[in-house]
Amino acid sequence: MTMSIEISPKSFFEQPSVADMRLISCPGAEELTGLIDKHLVRWAKAAGIEKDTFIIPCDCPRFQSGDAKGLVKESVRGDDIFIVVDPGNYNVTYKLFNYENHMSPDDHFANLKRLIQAVAGKAHRVSVIMPSLYGGRQHRRVVRESLDCAVALQELQTMGVRNIITFDAHDPRVQNAVPLMSFDNAMPTYQVLKSLLKKDPDLSFDKEKFTVVSPDEGAMNRNMYFSSVLGCNLGMFYKRRDYTRVVNGRNPIVAHEYLGESVEGKTVFIADDIIASGESMLEVASNLKERGAANIIANATFPLFTSGLDKFDKAVADGILTYVVGTNLTYRMPELLTRDWYVDVDVSKYAAYFVVALNHDMSVSSIIDPLKKIENLLANRK
């Protein structure tokens, strides 16, 4: 059956669900899981069903040697389980031989597998909400190297996971590794535009005043979507790399070359999946500023800022960047949330739609492509 993206409390329970819906949060994903849970509880109460929470308490305690185990603290027999994991949350720590050790994506993925094992054979069905796809940046083989994301997906399929829900995958074609498993890649385009207009209500999307620029060839699809729904023009950069050297695990970028029309006097919107160190984004923004761009808005679904915020503070102070738009789909350092130039987008309601749809075996097509909502958002401004 199909479902409108605007879920009413009545439609929430008017169809029989697959099984009782329950949420499990891996360590480090408590914030997003809690926000998803609030939407589900609110919808349930509006439909006359009293439910304090859908979250099952769990833990992944560590032994002093660093070994761990997954522990689920309530019965899950016959339940439709949704496990939320944030592989990018480096702020979670554990003791290892009396040293404070920060969790890596590998540690988070191991915890996910532990919790899947803890419910295996008892839950009716297990789905995984992994906003930032584990190993997603290692999605293809160029030389003799591992294919981490593909192997991880196959491992989850072998463990009995039925559905994977991710957001803005670095390359969604990685789902080819598990063609028989349900894999949904959602783009928070509507949520970003809504927050953008809340931040700047007077922002004009007229093609004479606004343009979209892709920071590289890999980000073209997401930027093409923005330019198509906004009705503005699209430019792009491509990276010239030195393939004779490897620095920090990648071939260093020699230069960014721009392809597109003039950006002079325009507001430029740059969308990418990740801001890691941010060097590429800042170099692209500086290049566009030199070409006469009036304002530059950077958007990244996963604002990691692995090298800190100082360079971005300076870029904003120097007038190179106007602001940066990110989401709460991964951990954000507390300092980032205090910056005036940062816009934090809440995507938890969008994720809650997926939980509801899958729990009722409803179509998620209208959720994945929110074109109607974007059209209404833009129409209401006129």
Features from the language model and the residues they span:
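PRPP-associated nucleotide enzymes
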Residues: 1-382
